[in-house]
């Protein structure tokens, strides 16, 4: 098995798994760290954790458990996947997790490559952009859990980790894989653990994929997976085979949206104009969760024959979110919404729903 991916949340794991498959690498996605070996025949395994916003100690422990399981399956290269908006404050866990993974693997250096140009995430001179805006000037500055106040990836990772950061800027990336590999080899300061990579286009990600094929540990958003998978598929003549390894299930579908990001708010606003949609009543979640889940289940089930999948959404704008958090508390409101969605998904599965679209 070639690649083992440790993803810090479920939606991100799904993103990177789909990019790997689309670019030619047969992939299996797992929810959580398995407790036993599995008879896998894929070339990549993605383990979905729930560590994006948890304390560093917990994130490190779970990430190391995932790494050790992937090592036991014979993976040759490892990929720590976080969000393309680098959701993490100075107290965040990206740096501590990278430090722990490097130590476990006996490595001294990795890369930071969150760029995903197809979604408007680019890196230039080490600064992360969302569309035309710097990260800290975008909607991410209002993120309810990880408000982003700086767009400079080197500074962000140095505040969290135990090492220094270096940069391979776009003019070098534009010269191709050999130039990137040479620049990596030329980083001779032993204090540098993290090398930030610029990327403005998919071609830059393809360049990175070739240049990093021998690096034991890489890190980034989903974008770098495009380059790694495409390079692997071209070298093994496997492009196109991965898409035939499994097909989506048929059957009733439902959309469950819990993210309160600016992008998800826009997507929910557009979708609810076209499909049956119902907002989550947080007070009902606290008053009688079991009864409220039954109410939502019955509503979704009644819409199963609609042309577009019905949607249940807790997505809301920052002002409303602040009022909710003030009333119920940040942690309590977040956990109760998660409990509601978990119970709702289980109830809908029992009703015969087979496709769950998790927005955000």
Stretches found by the model and what they are:
Residues 1-43, 61-63, 113-118:
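N-terminal basic/disordered segments at the start of proteins
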Residues 1-2, 43, 59, 67-78, ...:
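Cap/lid and interdomain-hinge subdomains that line or gate substrate/regulatory clefts
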Residues 5-7, 28-30, 78-82, 110-114, ...:
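General beta-strand structural signal in soluble alpha/beta enzymes
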Residues 9-12, 83-92, 117-119, 200-203, ...:
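Gly/Ser/Thr-rich loops at beta-strand to alpha-helix junctions
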Residues 32-34, 55-69, 340:
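Glycine-rich, highly charged phosphate/nucleotide-binding loops
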Residues 67, 101-109, 292-308:
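Short amphipathic alpha-helices and their capping/turn segments at secondary-structure boundaries
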Residues 131-298:
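Conserved, well-structured core segments that form the ligand-binding/active-site neighborhood
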Residues 300-359:
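C-terminal structural cap/anchor segments
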């Amino acid at each position: 098995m070639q690649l083992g991916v440790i993803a810090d949340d479920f939606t991100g794991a799904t993103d990177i798994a789909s990019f790997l498959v689309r670019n030619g690498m047969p992939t299996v996605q797992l929810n959580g760290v398995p407790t036993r070996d599995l008879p896998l025949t894929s070339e990549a395994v993605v383990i979905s954790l729930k560590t994006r916003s948890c304390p560093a100690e917990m994130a490190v422990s779970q990430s190391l458990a995932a790494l050790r399981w992937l090592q036991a399956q014979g993976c040759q290269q490892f990929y720590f996947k976080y969000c393309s908006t680098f959701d993490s404050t100075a107290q965040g866990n990206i740096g501590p997790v990278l430090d722990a993974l490097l130590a476990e693997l006996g490595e001294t250096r990795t890369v930071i490559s969150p760029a995903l140009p197809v979604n408007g995430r680019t890196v230039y001179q080490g600064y992360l952009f969302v569309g035309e805006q710097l990260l800290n000037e975008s909607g991410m500055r209002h993120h309810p859990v990880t408000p982003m106040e700086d767009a400079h990836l080197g500074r962000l990772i140095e505040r969290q980790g135990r090492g220094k950061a270096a940069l391979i800027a776009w003019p070098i990336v534009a010269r191709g894989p050999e130039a990137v590999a040479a620049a990596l080899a030329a980083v001779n300061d032993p204090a540098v653990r993290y090398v930030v990579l610029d990327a403005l286009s998919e071609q830059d990600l393809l360049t990175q994929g070739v240049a990093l094929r021998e690096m034991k540990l890489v890190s980034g958003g989903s974008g770098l997976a495009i380059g790694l998978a495409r390079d692997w598929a071209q070298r093994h003549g496997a492009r196109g085979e991965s898409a035939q390894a499994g097909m989506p299930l048929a059957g009733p579908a439902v959309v469950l949206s819990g993210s309160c990001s600016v992008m998800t708010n826009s997507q929910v606003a557009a979708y609810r104009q076209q499909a049956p949609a119902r907002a989550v009543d947080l007070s009902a979640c606290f008053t009688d969760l079991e009864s409220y889940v039954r109410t939502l289940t019955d509503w979704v089930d009644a819409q199963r024959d609609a042309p577009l999948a019905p949607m249940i959404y807790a997505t809301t704008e920052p002002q409303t979110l602040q009022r909710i958090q003030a009333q119920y508390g940040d942690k309590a409101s977040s956990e109760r919404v998660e409990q509601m969605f978990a119970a709702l998904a289980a109830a809908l599965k029992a009703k015969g729903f087979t496709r769950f679209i998790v927005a955000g």
